[in-house]
A protein has these predicted regions:
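Solvent-exposed, low-complexity segments and loops of surface/extracellular structural proteins
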Residues: 8, 155-157, 179-181
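Beta-barrel outer-membrane channel/assembly domains of diderm bacteria
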Residues: 8-9, 17, 21-118, 122-125, ...
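Flexible, surface-exposed loop regions and adjacent strand-edge segments
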Residues: 63, 127-131, 191, 248-254, ...
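Flexible, solvent-exposed coil segments and beta strand-coil junctions
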Residues: 116-123, 172-175, 252-262
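Outer-membrane beta-barrel signature, preferentially recognizing the C-terminal barrel domain
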Residues: 132, 162, 265-275
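Long, well-ordered mid-to-C-terminal structural blocks that present hydrophobic/aromatic surfaces
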Residues: 213-251
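Solvent-exposed loop segments that connect transmembrane elements
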Residues: 243-266, 299-302
Length: 342
Protein backbone atom coordinates (compact mmCIF):
# COMPACT_ATOMS: atom_id res chain seq x y z
CA UNK A 1 0.00 0.00 0.00
CA UNK A 2 2.86 2.38 0.84
CA UNK A 3 4.54 1.76 -2.54
CA UNK A 4 1.32 2.53 -4.41
CA UNK A 5 0.83 5.80 -2.51
CA UNK A 6 4.50 6.76 -3.02
CA UNK A 7 4.29 6.02 -6.76
CA UNK A 8 1.08 8.05 -7.03
CA UNK A 9 2.61 11.04 -5.21
CA UNK A 10 5.70 10.96 -7.47
CA UNK A 11 3.48 10.79 -10.53
CA UNK A 12 1.45 13.81 -9.37
CA UNK A 13 4.58 15.83 -8.52
CA UNK A 14 6.17 15.03 -11.88
CA UNK A 15 2.99 16.00 -13.69
CA UNK A 16 2.79 19.32 -11.82
CA UNK A 17 6.47 20.10 -12.48
CA UNK A 18 6.08 19.35 -16.20
CA UNK A 19 2.96 21.49 -16.28
CA UNK A 20 4.80 24.42 -14.67
CA UNK A 21 7.70 24.04 -17.12
CA UNK A 22 5.25 24.03 -20.05
CA UNK A 23 3.51 27.13 -18.70
CA UNK A 24 6.86 28.90 -18.27
CA UNK A 25 7.97 27.98 -21.80
CA UNK A 26 4.62 29.09 -23.19
CA UNK A 27 4.92 32.39 -21.34
CA UNK A 28 8.42 32.96 -22.75
CA UNK A 29 7.20 32.18 -26.26
CA UNK A 30 4.27 34.58 -25.86
CA UNK A 31 6.56 37.34 -24.53
CA UNK A 32 9.01 36.89 -27.41
CA UNK A 33 6.19 36.78 -29.95
CA UNK A 34 4.60 39.91 -28.50
CA UNK A 35 7.95 41.71 -28.59
CA UNK A 36 8.54 40.65 -32.19
CA UNK A 37 5.04 41.71 -33.24
CA UNK A 38 5.49 45.06 -31.48
CA UNK A 39 8.87 45.61 -33.18
CA UNK A 40 7.49 44.78 -36.62
CA UNK A 41 4.42 46.96 -36.04
CA UNK A 42 6.59 49.91 -35.01
CA UNK A 43 8.84 49.58 -38.07
CA UNK A 44 8.43 52.06 -40.89
CA UNK A 45 8.92 51.00 -44.48
CA UNK A 46 8.67 52.69 -47.84
CA UNK A 47 9.07 51.75 -51.48
CA UNK A 48 9.82 53.74 -54.62
CA UNK A 49 10.38 53.05 -58.28
CA UNK A 50 12.05 55.29 -60.84
CA UNK A 51 12.22 54.67 -64.58
CA UNK A 52 14.55 56.45 -67.01
CA UNK A 53 13.81 56.13 -70.74
CA UNK A 54 16.46 57.40 -73.14
CA UNK A 55 14.40 58.98 -75.90
CA UNK A 56 17.33 60.55 -77.76
CA UNK A 57 16.73 58.19 -80.67
CA UNK A 58 12.98 57.60 -80.92
CA UNK A 59 13.61 54.59 -83.19
CA UNK A 60 15.92 52.90 -80.69
CA UNK A 61 14.85 53.73 -77.15
CA UNK A 62 16.49 52.20 -74.09
CA UNK A 63 15.86 52.48 -70.39
CA UNK A 64 15.85 50.89 -67.00
CA UNK A 65 13.91 50.90 -63.75
CA UNK A 66 15.28 51.08 -60.22
CA UNK A 67 13.01 49.90 -57.41
CA UNK A 68 14.03 50.72 -53.85
CA UNK A 69 12.65 49.28 -50.61
CA UNK A 70 13.55 50.94 -47.30
CA UNK A 71 13.02 49.73 -43.73
CA UNK A 72 13.56 51.76 -40.54
CA UNK A 73 13.31 49.94 -37.23
CA UNK A 74 14.68 50.81 -33.78
CA UNK A 75 17.64 52.82 -35.04
CA UNK A 76 18.37 50.43 -37.91
CA UNK A 77 18.04 51.64 -41.52
CA UNK A 78 18.24 49.23 -44.48
CA UNK A 79 17.64 50.14 -48.11
CA UNK A 80 18.12 47.99 -51.22
CA UNK A 81 17.87 48.54 -54.98
CA UNK A 82 16.64 46.25 -57.75
CA UNK A 83 17.47 47.21 -61.35
CA UNK A 84 15.56 46.06 -64.41
CA UNK A 85 16.80 46.98 -67.88
CA UNK A 86 14.70 47.05 -71.02
CA UNK A 87 17.03 44.43 -72.53
CA UNK A 88 15.78 41.99 -69.89
CA UNK A 89 18.82 41.98 -67.60
CA UNK A 90 18.43 42.55 -63.86
CA UNK A 91 20.69 43.23 -60.90
CA UNK A 92 20.47 44.02 -57.21
CA UNK A 93 22.49 46.15 -54.86
CA UNK A 94 22.60 47.41 -51.28
CA UNK A 95 21.91 51.14 -51.13
CA UNK A 96 22.17 52.07 -47.45
CA UNK A 97 22.57 50.00 -44.28
CA UNK A 98 23.41 51.66 -41.00
CA UNK A 99 22.58 51.78 -37.31
CA UNK A 100 22.23 55.00 -35.30
CA UNK A 101 22.36 55.55 -31.56
CA UNK A 102 22.19 58.52 -29.22
CA UNK A 103 25.43 59.16 -27.33
CA UNK A 104 24.41 60.28 -23.84
CA UNK A 105 22.49 63.22 -25.25
CA UNK A 106 25.59 64.81 -26.80
CA UNK A 107 24.97 63.68 -30.36
CA UNK A 108 24.21 60.76 -32.66
CA UNK A 109 26.63 58.05 -33.76
CA UNK A 110 25.91 56.29 -37.06
CA UNK A 111 27.78 53.23 -38.35
CA UNK A 112 27.44 51.63 -41.78
CA UNK A 113 26.81 52.61 -45.39
CA UNK A 114 25.31 56.07 -45.94
CA UNK A 115 24.48 58.45 -48.76
CA UNK A 116 25.93 61.71 -47.47
CA UNK A 117 25.57 65.26 -48.73
CA UNK A 118 27.24 68.39 -47.38
CA UNK A 119 26.80 72.03 -48.30
CA UNK A 120 26.49 72.83 -52.00
CA UNK A 121 27.55 69.29 -52.88
CA UNK A 122 30.79 70.27 -54.61
CA UNK A 123 32.76 67.49 -52.88
CA UNK A 124 30.10 65.20 -51.35
CA UNK A 125 26.51 64.99 -52.57
CA UNK A 126 23.66 62.66 -53.49
CA UNK A 127 22.11 62.29 -56.93
CA UNK A 128 18.71 63.97 -56.93
CA UNK A 129 17.77 62.99 -60.48
CA UNK A 130 20.02 60.30 -61.95
CA UNK A 131 20.51 56.65 -61.11
CA UNK A 132 24.06 56.81 -59.73
CA UNK A 133 24.62 56.15 -56.03
CA UNK A 134 27.32 57.93 -54.03
CA UNK A 135 27.53 55.99 -50.77
CA UNK A 136 30.38 55.70 -48.29
CA UNK A 137 31.13 53.03 -45.68
CA UNK A 138 32.19 54.32 -42.30
CA UNK A 139 30.96 56.13 -39.24
CA UNK A 140 29.51 59.57 -38.61
CA UNK A 141 29.10 61.50 -35.37
CA UNK A 142 26.73 64.47 -35.52
CA UNK A 143 26.02 67.08 -32.89
CA UNK A 144 24.68 70.61 -32.53
CA UNK A 145 26.72 73.15 -30.60
CA UNK A 146 25.43 76.71 -30.09
CA UNK A 147 23.60 76.73 -33.40
CA UNK A 148 26.44 75.05 -35.33
CA UNK A 149 25.73 71.59 -36.75
CA UNK A 150 28.85 69.43 -36.80
CA UNK A 151 29.46 66.12 -38.56
CA UNK A 152 32.72 64.21 -38.22
CA UNK A 153 33.55 60.73 -39.35
CA UNK A 154 35.31 58.32 -41.67
CA UNK A 155 34.65 57.21 -45.24
CA UNK A 156 36.95 54.18 -45.42
CA UNK A 157 35.31 51.90 -42.88
CA UNK A 158 36.35 52.44 -39.27
CA UNK A 159 39.94 53.22 -40.24
CA UNK A 160 40.89 56.89 -40.04
CA UNK A 161 42.91 57.18 -43.26
CA UNK A 162 39.86 58.78 -44.95
CA UNK A 163 38.10 61.21 -42.61
CA UNK A 164 36.06 64.39 -42.77
CA UNK A 165 34.56 67.15 -40.68
CA UNK A 166 31.68 69.42 -41.73
CA UNK A 167 30.25 72.42 -39.91
CA UNK A 168 27.18 74.41 -40.91
CA UNK A 169 24.99 77.10 -39.44
CA UNK A 170 22.68 80.01 -40.19
CA UNK A 171 22.56 83.35 -38.41
CA UNK A 172 20.46 86.42 -39.30
CA UNK A 173 20.15 85.52 -42.97
CA UNK A 174 23.77 84.40 -43.33
CA UNK A 175 24.43 80.69 -43.94
CA UNK A 176 27.82 79.00 -43.82
CA UNK A 177 29.12 75.51 -44.53
CA UNK A 178 32.69 74.30 -44.25
CA UNK A 179 33.78 70.80 -45.31
CA UNK A 180 37.29 69.38 -44.95
CA UNK A 181 38.32 65.91 -46.14
CA UNK A 182 41.60 64.07 -45.56
CA UNK A 183 41.95 61.16 -48.00
CA UNK A 184 45.23 59.46 -47.13
CA UNK A 185 46.94 62.84 -46.69
CA UNK A 186 45.27 64.33 -49.79
CA UNK A 187 43.40 67.26 -48.28
CA UNK A 188 40.36 68.75 -50.04
CA UNK A 189 37.95 71.40 -48.80
CA UNK A 190 34.86 73.35 -49.76
CA UNK A 191 33.48 76.52 -48.19
CA UNK A 192 29.98 77.85 -48.88
CA UNK A 193 28.65 81.26 -47.90
CA UNK A 194 25.09 82.42 -48.47
CA UNK A 195 23.15 85.57 -47.71
CA UNK A 196 19.38 86.03 -47.90
CA UNK A 197 17.66 89.42 -48.02
CA UNK A 198 14.35 91.03 -49.00
CA UNK A 199 12.46 88.50 -46.86
CA UNK A 200 14.16 85.64 -48.66
CA UNK A 201 13.34 86.83 -52.19
CA UNK A 202 16.98 87.63 -53.02
CA UNK A 203 19.70 85.08 -52.28
CA UNK A 204 23.44 85.43 -52.87
CA UNK A 205 25.92 82.54 -52.73
CA UNK A 206 29.68 82.09 -52.90
CA UNK A 207 31.64 78.82 -52.98
CA UNK A 208 35.37 78.10 -52.85
CA UNK A 209 36.71 74.56 -53.22
CA UNK A 210 40.03 72.74 -53.62
CA UNK A 211 40.06 69.10 -54.76
CA UNK A 212 43.42 68.36 -53.09
CA UNK A 213 45.14 67.92 -56.46
CA UNK A 214 45.83 71.63 -57.10
CA UNK A 215 42.61 72.33 -59.02
CA UNK A 216 40.43 75.02 -57.45
CA UNK A 217 36.85 76.06 -58.08
CA UNK A 218 35.16 79.39 -57.39
CA UNK A 219 31.44 79.97 -57.91
CA UNK A 220 29.29 83.05 -57.36
CA UNK A 221 25.53 82.94 -57.70
CA UNK A 222 22.34 84.93 -57.32
CA UNK A 223 18.70 83.83 -57.22
CA UNK A 224 15.63 86.06 -57.13
CA UNK A 225 11.99 85.19 -56.54
CA UNK A 226 10.12 87.30 -59.09
CA UNK A 227 6.86 86.24 -57.49
CA UNK A 228 5.59 83.27 -55.51
CA UNK A 229 5.94 80.61 -58.23
CA UNK A 230 8.61 82.10 -60.50
CA UNK A 231 12.32 82.50 -59.77
CA UNK A 232 15.38 83.39 -61.85
CA UNK A 233 18.99 82.52 -61.14
CA UNK A 234 22.52 83.04 -62.44
CA UNK A 235 25.95 81.59 -61.63
CA UNK A 236 29.54 82.15 -62.67
CA UNK A 237 31.93 79.23 -62.07
CA UNK A 238 35.68 79.27 -62.67
CA UNK A 239 38.30 76.52 -62.40
CA UNK A 240 41.97 77.35 -61.93
CA UNK A 241 44.99 76.35 -59.87
CA UNK A 242 48.51 74.97 -60.10
CA UNK A 243 47.49 71.73 -61.79
CA UNK A 244 48.03 71.28 -65.52
CA UNK A 245 45.54 73.08 -67.74
CA UNK A 246 42.80 70.63 -68.69
CA UNK A 247 42.92 68.72 -65.38
CA UNK A 248 39.32 67.99 -64.35
CA UNK A 249 38.28 68.88 -60.80
CA UNK A 250 38.42 65.61 -58.82
CA UNK A 251 35.35 64.89 -56.66
CA UNK A 252 34.35 61.20 -57.01
CA UNK A 253 31.87 61.39 -54.11
CA UNK A 254 29.85 64.20 -55.70
CA UNK A 255 27.07 63.93 -58.27
CA UNK A 256 28.90 66.72 -60.11
CA UNK A 257 31.52 64.13 -61.06
CA UNK A 258 29.00 62.59 -63.49
CA UNK A 259 27.17 65.84 -64.17
CA UNK A 260 24.40 65.72 -66.76
CA UNK A 261 23.59 62.05 -66.13
CA UNK A 262 22.75 63.09 -62.56
CA UNK A 263 20.87 66.20 -63.63
CA UNK A 264 23.49 68.78 -62.63
CA UNK A 265 26.19 70.79 -64.37
CA UNK A 266 29.40 68.70 -64.25
CA UNK A 267 32.72 69.75 -62.81
CA UNK A 268 34.96 71.35 -65.42
CA UNK A 269 38.73 71.42 -65.91
CA UNK A 270 41.45 73.83 -64.91
CA UNK A 271 41.37 76.76 -67.32
CA UNK A 272 37.62 76.62 -67.96
CA UNK A 273 34.74 78.77 -66.75
CA UNK A 274 30.97 78.63 -67.07
CA UNK A 275 28.22 81.23 -67.11
CA UNK A 276 24.80 79.83 -66.19
CA UNK A 277 21.43 81.53 -66.02
CA UNK A 278 17.84 80.37 -66.11
CA UNK A 279 14.41 80.30 -64.52
CA UNK A 280 12.09 77.90 -62.73
CA UNK A 281 8.30 77.94 -62.49
CA UNK A 282 6.42 75.81 -59.97
CA UNK A 283 2.62 75.53 -59.97
CA UNK A 284 2.47 72.65 -57.53
CA UNK A 285 1.44 69.73 -59.73
CA UNK A 286 3.37 71.14 -62.70
CA UNK A 287 6.99 72.34 -62.50
CA UNK A 288 9.20 73.76 -65.25
CA UNK A 289 12.83 74.88 -65.38
CA UNK A 290 15.18 76.06 -68.10
CA UNK A 291 18.89 76.82 -67.74
CA UNK A 292 21.51 77.92 -70.26
CA UNK A 293 25.22 77.28 -69.74
CA UNK A 294 28.13 78.72 -71.68
CA UNK A 295 31.47 76.98 -71.10
CA UNK A 296 34.63 78.67 -72.35
CA UNK A 297 38.38 78.52 -71.92
CA UNK A 298 39.95 81.22 -69.80
CA UNK A 299 42.86 81.66 -72.21
CA UNK A 300 41.29 80.38 -75.41
CA UNK A 301 38.50 80.86 -77.89
CA UNK A 302 36.77 77.46 -77.60
CA UNK A 303 33.18 77.62 -76.38
CA UNK A 304 30.44 75.07 -75.73
CA UNK A 305 26.78 75.91 -75.12
CA UNK A 306 24.52 73.74 -72.97
CA UNK A 307 20.79 74.03 -72.40
CA UNK A 308 18.87 72.08 -69.77
CA UNK A 309 15.06 71.90 -69.92
CA UNK A 310 13.03 70.03 -67.31
CA UNK A 311 9.28 69.49 -67.02
CA UNK A 312 7.45 67.42 -64.39
CA UNK A 313 3.81 66.65 -63.70
CA UNK A 314 2.40 65.23 -60.44
CA UNK A 315 -0.10 62.71 -61.82
CA UNK A 316 -1.40 61.74 -58.36
CA UNK A 317 -0.17 61.40 -54.79
CA UNK A 318 2.13 58.51 -55.75
CA UNK A 319 3.20 59.12 -59.35
CA UNK A 320 5.25 61.83 -61.09
CA UNK A 321 5.93 62.04 -64.82
CA UNK A 322 8.97 63.91 -66.09
CA UNK A 323 10.64 65.08 -69.27
CA UNK A 324 14.24 66.30 -69.50
CA UNK A 325 16.19 67.55 -72.47
CA UNK A 326 19.80 68.64 -72.88
CA UNK A 327 21.25 70.29 -75.91
CA UNK A 328 25.02 70.43 -76.26
CA UNK A 329 25.80 72.65 -79.23
CA UNK A 330 23.71 70.97 -81.97
CA UNK A 331 23.22 67.56 -80.29
CA UNK A 332 19.98 66.83 -78.41
CA UNK A 333 19.51 64.33 -75.57
CA UNK A 334 16.04 63.63 -74.17
CA UNK A 335 14.80 61.48 -71.29
CA UNK A 336 11.35 60.51 -70.03
CA UNK A 337 11.06 59.63 -66.34
CA UNK A 338 8.38 57.97 -64.22
CA UNK A 339 8.58 58.10 -60.42
CA UNK A 340 6.31 56.08 -58.12
CA UNK A 341 6.46 56.17 -54.32
CA UNK A 342 4.58 54.39 -51.54
Amino acid sequence: GHEIRYTYICHVLTKNINLKIMKKNLRNVLVLSLGLITTIASAQWSASSNTWIDNTNSDDRSGFTRSTVTLDMSGVHISGDHYWNTDGTTSQGLYEAYVSSDVMGFGTLTLGRQDLSFGSGVLVSSSNWGANRYTTDGMDFSMSLSGININAGTMGGINTDVNYINASGEFAGVSINALMIDNQDVKSNAYDLGYSMMNGDLNLSYTMADDGYDTEMTRMGVAYNVFENLSVHGHMTQYEGESAVGTVFNAPMSSMSEGLSDGVMPHLANGQEAMSYGLSYDLGDIAFSYTMHNVSETDGDAEVDYTDLSLSYQLNDNCTLGYRSWKIDDTDYTFITVGIGL
